[in-house]
Amino acid sequence: MTGTHTTTGTPSAAAVSARDWGWRHTTRRDFALRHVNFDIQPGERVLLLGASGAGKSTLMAALAGVLGGADDGEEEGSLTIDGVDARQARVRSGLVLQDPDSQIILERVGDDAAFGCESLGVPRDEIWQRVHESLDIVGLDDIALDRSTQHLSGGQRQRLALAGVLAMHPGLLLLDEPTANLDPTGVREVHDAVRQVLERTHETMIVVEHHIDVWLDLIDRVIVLGKPESSGDSDGVSADDHTGGVIADGTPDEVFAAMGDVLAAGGAWVPGRRIPTTYRDADGVLQPLAARDRDPQVQARVCSPEPLLIADDLSFGRGKPLGEHVNLSFYGGEVYALMGPNGAGKSTLALTLAGLLPPLAGHVRVSADMVPDGRSDDPHAWTSRELLGRVGMVFQEPEHQFATGSVRAEVALGPKSMGKSDEEANRIADDMLARLGLTRFAPANPYTLSGGEKRRLSVASMLAAAPRVLIMDEPTFGQDFATWTEMLRLIAIARDEGSAVIMVTHDEPLVEALGACRVMVTPANDSDVNGISNVSGARDDIGVRLGADSASAADVVNAADADGAANDVTVRAAAATPVVRVTPPSDRTETERPASPSWFVAKLNPVTRFAMGLLMCIPMFFSLDVVSASVALGIEFILLWIGGVDPLTVARKTWPVWIGAAGAFISIALYGQASGATYLHFGAINITQGSLYLACAMFLRVLAIALPSVILALGLDPTDLADGLVQLVHLPSRFVYGGLAGMRMFTLLQDDWRALGLSRRSRGLGDEGAVRRAIAQAFSLLVLSIRRATKLATAMEARGFGGDQPRSVARVSKLHPVDGLGYVIAVVVPVFALIVAITTGFWNQPLLS
């Protein structure tokens, strides 16, 4: 990729050294790492491996200088970057984490990329040169700097996080599983972006990744960490038959030749490792993993003759349809893989099939033998308890599912809710925990597990309920090879016990190993999909199942042609992958928000707009009469009309204010202080001349105070306001920008709240009373908010936020003559209204004259 901007200086590659280094978190008994020794030369590209729990992420956080100090844990030995303690050398390292959402700090692309440079005090002119340069390197140079980060795909967000790090010129690039949350396209995007970075900057790189093959062409050295002795894992084989520290160090060929078996046992995806083709069922009998390889008798026994779940002319989405006229049938004894790019709508389709989101049009139906007594065949119409054991959903975010205080209770919850005894439910839970290597965590709180362990727990808790239709959103995310293999086995067992398993996944090895039928969910403008069976926008009722008699066949059954005649159609899976066409993500972006409905207000500095709202309110608080409120309100309407906002637009934009003002009028008119003539008296209701006057005064005062404040706030950009508060009002940047980042997190928490409600419905807990349900969800949301805040704080700290150096600014906030006019208006209008009321004798008069 050719750069188009002048280089502002290439960062020098950093040298890294560890001398008998170790770290123990304050809340843990055992050391996360111990006796770590290595030297990394400038420009080296290192792959950091180790079993789950070996402390890879802890080491990466330490190198980024965000691990904490003496209050956060106990440190041994030394860890340095260019000879300086890693905590003091934070400006020399840049950390990119797993989750793109947890690293996006500001709303606009350019602001987010510039955030780290501002934290380091880089001069303003150089900031934008660095931003353009870094966005160019990662392939985002064609995206407008003012574009909202909410409209980026997962791969684009991760590349933006990488660009924000590159703009800091760190010298040491730290990548902690940066592709774990991405689809194959996103993985390629990030990989290629990193390759561009290394070719142009020659920075030192350390990357942590389970899937070694992703980075194999970019690395020249492999370092393997072992677990400290006290952290042994009793649940299975791992690479911890060592005292910790570095157990292997060399070129990729040397390490994989010498340590391949140990790494594989520890869970790494070693190149050349064979994917299993068989598994042992609950009786210990060897069975094929791929459905196409099953014995015909087994096939006949486990496969349902009729579909268990049908999408009939389905339109799905959240408010606006993402896909329309979708027709699919899912059979028992089969595995289906909903595949496609990030953001296409796979999870939304899965939630709709699970009966958790209502169809926008059409129907989702289940087979007759699954319908609860007296109910329709639409799972969305069922109660939460009726869903349990029939249709189950494993959510993309495991923490959305947690509803108990221990790992064991989490798995036992489903069986208990289905009426099984405590003893039987606990037996099922213990068996499931043993299968997934979670036995030692049985008494632990689910929130204390690692990301991969949480994913296994979320799958185990739903498998324990043995639903007839099991829908799983990214079931193998974050798994090493050992736990991935066990997850593969559990899915195969569920399938061969007659369940229809529907997976949202990007995991090609998983799909291949299970012989799953692919259903592509892809944007309507994507011409690269190899499929002839378009199941959206058509009238066909297409059911897809794997053929038992062919290694690569998929039967399309119960099809109807355009004339409605039934046909039995058989097509090859390789050529006839069903395709659900959805609205392209680029077409779902929100229209650009105007800075204000008023041309005059749009020209004002955000701080001026904020201050005007306050200044216009304060004098009116000292008045409660019809005249002052009427004068102020009349002048405000005239000024808004001159500024380009007609009265009808004002009313439309501020309708909640009018409702509030009307409510105040009614309550005061009916129950206000009585004086003057009485018009109606009935019980507590007493409408008098005085109460009506006060009601009118309150109605007008509410409008006079609130209408201009709302118009001034409409379209106000939070980032521009934050810049103004720091630069013009001189509020502490740490307070202002921390609050700004928190505002963005609030949007994510709204999504979390909705997901928690859907999850509790899926787990049989959605029939509780509204108050009890809200309390339970509020606790879960509190935990999620703390965890999100922690991740966000880490991302901000990794970008230099809160450091000792003075902060610079990328966007200058200035006041102009028009702002002076705004301040004059804000003072003159309410003061003039008060003067008129005082001179006419109406100021705060309780009765009409």
What is each model feature region?
Residues 148-152, 156, 445-449, 453:
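Conserved ABC ATPase signature
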Residues 173-177, 470-474:
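Catalytic Walker B motif of ABC-type/P-loop ATPase nucleotide-binding domains
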Residues 228-272, 521-584:
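Conserved beta-strand-loop-alpha-helix hinge in the C-terminal portion
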Residues 165-166, 462-463:
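ABC ATPase C-loop
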Residues 64, 354:
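Helix-to-loop junction immediately C-terminal to a conserved catalytic motif
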Residues 585-628, 632-637, 751-849:
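Transmembrane alpha-helix interface motif
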Residues 49-51, 339-341:
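The feature captures the beta-strand-to-loop junction immediately N-terminal to the Walker
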Residues 126-143, 423-441:
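Conserved ABC ATPase "signature" region
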